[in-house]
């Protein structure tokens, strides 16, 4: 498995924001759903089945053929997304001519030099250092690692953030992500997750959660900070990295999902690598759509 964590397989329909948790989602199974596949995770949203699979050791052709058959059973169009360039080459080599690949900028991963995020050295991080310093001066804050004793505090932050951003109780990505966060905390240790929590005047106000992908790469899945505290995101970002991620070469902070503010924020930290991601559709289905459009 590389720095990206996983390949994601889904069918036609609106992409859900649940995929903030992409590589950990592979190992979460909702207790209310029957298991139909081995090493696959199925989620239901907006009436469409979303399927995720990791490309790693094993027979790639048999994995893809399995979900192709299932998509056909459901009468759904088939799509792969979150593919690296290397993975598109693997697919093309394994099943030549079957897929049409397209760059998906919204799904591309932001990968940072860990030392740059920890030390914020140099002119290009001048504004970040000042922002962090203002937070540290302005608030009575404390940091702690996430443990079973503060899981509830983190979930409370996630819920309050969801309410503040108008997502809870709605069929949108914000509510889906909050669901994924709660699922993650139910199996935190089993998933080998780790994270950090910030408090202001004793109140839990921000947390971050991730996992080690390999000895050189740490992947951050979730980062939530409540409104009303200037510099809070900068603070949780810095404190967790400084106290826990010194020994990693890279920190993968995942994609921006095409959200303008999120893209601006992630670019402002000067990623060392913007890892391009691709989607793949069946050439046969793409050609059918093109023919229909031409007829109409």
Question: Which residue stretches match the model-derived regions?
Answer:
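Aromatic (often tryptophan-rich) hydrophobic motifs at membrane interfaces
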Residues: 193-283
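A mid-sequence, solvent-exposed acidic-amphipathic segment
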Residues: 156-215, 219
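Active-site/acyl-donor-binding loops of N-acyltransferases
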Residues: 100-120, 252-296
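Non-catalytic accessory segments adjacent to catalytic cores
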Residues: 76-104
């Amino acid at each position: 498995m590389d720095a990206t964590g996983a390949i994601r397989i889904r069918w036609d329909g609106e992409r859900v924001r649940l995929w903030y948790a992409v590589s950990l989602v592979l190992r979460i199974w909702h207790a209310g759903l029957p298991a139909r596949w081995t090493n696959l995770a199925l989620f239901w949203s907006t009436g469409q089945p979303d399927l995720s699979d990791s490309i790693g050791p094993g027979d790639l052709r048999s994995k893809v053929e399995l979900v192709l058959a299932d998509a056909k059973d459901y009468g759904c169009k088939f799509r792969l997304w979150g593919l690296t360039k290397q993975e598109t080459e693997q697919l093309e080599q394994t099943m030549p001519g079957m897929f049409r690949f397209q760059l998906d900028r919204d799904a591309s991963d932001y990968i940072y030099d860990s030392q740059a995020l920890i030390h914020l050295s140099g002119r290009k991080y001048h504004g970040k250092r000042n922002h962090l310093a203002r937070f540290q001066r302005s608030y009575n804050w404390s940091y702690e690692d996430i443990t079973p004793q503060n899981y509830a505090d983190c979930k409370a932050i996630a819920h309050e953030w969801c309410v503040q951003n108008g997502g809870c109780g709605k069929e949108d990505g914000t509510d889906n992500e909050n669901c994924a966060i709660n699922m993650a905390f139910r199996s935190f240790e089993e998933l080998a997750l780790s994270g950090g929590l910030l408090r202001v005047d004793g109140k839990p106000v921000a947390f971050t959660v991730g996992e080690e992908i390999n000895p050189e790469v740490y992947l951050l899945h979730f980062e939530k900070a409540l409104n009303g505290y200037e510099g809070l995101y900068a603070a949780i970002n810095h404190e967790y990295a400084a106290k826990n991620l010194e020994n990693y070469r890279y920190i993968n902070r995942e994609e921006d999902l095409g959200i303008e503010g999120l893209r601006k924020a992630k670019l402002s930290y000067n990623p060392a690598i913007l890892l391009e991601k691709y989607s793949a559709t069946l050439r046969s289905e793409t050609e059918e759509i093109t023919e229909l459009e031409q007829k109409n």
